A protein has these predicted regions:
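An N-terminal hydrophobic leader/cap segment in hydrolases
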Residues: 1-48, 55-60
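Conserved alpha/beta-hydrolase
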Residues: 79, 86-112
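Alpha/beta-hydrolase active-site loop
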Residues: 117-137
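Alpha/beta-hydrolase-fold enzymes
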Residues: 155-242
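Short alpha-helix in the alpha/beta-hydrolase fold that links the catalytic acid
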Residues: 266, 275, 289-298
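Short beta-strand/loop motif that positions the catalytic acidic residue
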Residues: 273, 279-281
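Acidic catalytic loop of the alpha/beta-hydrolase fold
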Residues: 284-288
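Catalytic active-site module of serine/aspartate enzymes centered on a nucleophile-bearing elbow/loop
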Residues: 304, 309-349
Length: 349
């Protein structure tokens, strides 16, 4: 287990009001169905990193816990986007803690242009995740890491650097390769690198619009989900709580993302992560590379790949028929980890 003292002083506090943290009206709720809103029993907390940065997190305990998990989202995402998923995980016996990355959700942001993505220091993100997890009470059950997209890439970095912190990991469409559309990947990397060193790192990439110009998505045009309600969750929260908003990628952010995926995609890097991993790969993907998922699944020593050919980028937000297949795989995977901890033989279908 990681010794948190290696990072310096940090602290973990609860409870607090998310809306109060964001300086907004706690009674102003987004126009979303009740299952997408804060679940009963949910508690907010604050984690203070050794450098003083405050990261917001939330906790939903399970009535009869058989495992615990730390959930981290992808680029631009916030805890609120995962309320339904958090509720479903808790109903399955997982005590859930969900963390906002720096610069996203209710965690600390730069004062100037707080919605603008900076060039991310992904090593620091991995440190934040490790420090936060090490500050939690020692687990009596298996501890899992659940991560989506950018969060999945940071998760792999954390798992490689801090072995023993988690017993297993569940990765949803992890950012192991970045789709660049009609622009060849090498050209895109060259452009972002040149823009960064030219002082244009905070400029939005071509075709990206600031959030205020975004309209409510439909399942036909949404790039993350084909579900008519779940595809609007983030828009609902962003339109109601301005403090949660994040703009699209900048040259600086994308340049650092390219560097990260090059690092974590190396065979020797992946070979050093030996805990059980369940990896979901979406078939209708516009953000990350499914081929990179297949390659990683071959190189990781203990990885099960779940391909969802009819899913867009976010399996946790997809239509029930797709989402249920993903949760079926999660149920079986969690049961394996619980059985392994208890020393009971478990049938693997």
């Amino acid at each position: 287990m990681l010794d948190n003292s290696a990072f310096g002083a940090s602290s973990l506090q609860e409870p607090m009001s998310s809306a109060r943290w964001l300086g907004q009206d706690p009674d102003r709720m987004p126009p979303l169905p009740a299952r997408f809103l804060e679940p009963s029993g949910f508690v907010w907390g604050k984690f203070t990193a050794p450098d003083g940065a405050r990261l917001r997190w939330g906790h939903l305990p399970a009535e009869r816990p058989r495992a615990e998990c730390v959930v981290v989202g992808g680029f631009t995402e916030c805890v609120e986007k995962y309320f339904e998923t958090i509720t479903d995980l808790a109903a399955r016996g997982l005590s859930v803690r969900c963390l906002d990355w720096r610069g996203q959700g209710g965690s600390d942001r730069p004062r100037r242009w707080p919605t603008r993505p900076r060039p991310r220091r992904f090593e620091r993100d991995a440190d934040d995740l490790a420090q936060f997890t090490a500050a939690l009470p020692p687990p009596g059950n298996p501890r899992l890491l659940i991560a989506h997209s950018m969060g999945g890439a940071i998760a792999l970095l954390c798992l490689r650097r801090f072995p023993g912190l988690f017993d297993a990991a569940i990765l949803s469409a992890p950012m192991l390769g970045i789709r660049t559309g009609r622009v060849p990947r090498g050209v895109a990397r060259c452009i972002t690198g040149t823009a960064r060193v030219s002082g244009l790192g905070l400029c939005l990439i071509p075709g990206a619009a600031r959030w205020r110009h975004v309209r409510s998505p439909s399942p036909e045009v949404s790039r993350i989900s084909s579900d008519p309600e779940r595809c609007r969750i983030q828009y609902g929260w962003f339109s109601t709580r301005a403090g949660l908003r994040v703009d699209p990628p900048t040259y600086g952010w994308l340049n650092e993302a390219f560097r990260l995926v090059a690092r974590i995609g190396r065979a020797e890097f992946l070979a050093g992560i030996d805990i059980p991993i369940l990896l979901a790969s979406a078939g209708i993907e516009q953000f990350v590379e499914p081929d990179a998922h297949r390659r990683a699944a071959r190189l990781l020593p203990n990885c099960t790949l779940i391909e969802l050919p009819d899913s867009k980028h976010e399996p946790f937000l997809e239509q029930d028929a797709i989402r249920n297949r993903w949760f079926d795989a999660i149920d079986g995977f969690v049961a394996q980890q619980v059985a392994a901890r208890s020393g009971v033989d478990h049938y693997r279908p």
